[in-house]
């Protein structure tokens, strides 16, 4: 079975073996590390499982703004106190407008 949690962890670490394994399934053009990580983050948000929150908190600090934006969106979908606290903290230091909008939107969806 497919282990999204392990894949996200491997992508955070930029594990070449995992990237190559995915590339063999979907094609090298679609297997760029940042693209794979963004897709995995979106999938994690759609699963809405709290187990992904610690990984998404890590990706919320990624240097690539679209990955931070997707992470904020996913944390908003999952919700919970830990996600809300991480989003509020990230908002304080975020400078990218798109990421700020995603964080604010995510915070608005968490009860």
Predicted regions and their residues:
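Polar/charged alpha-helical tracts
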Residues: 20, 54, 97-101, 105
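Non-heme iron-sulfur electron-transfer modules
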Residues: 1-13
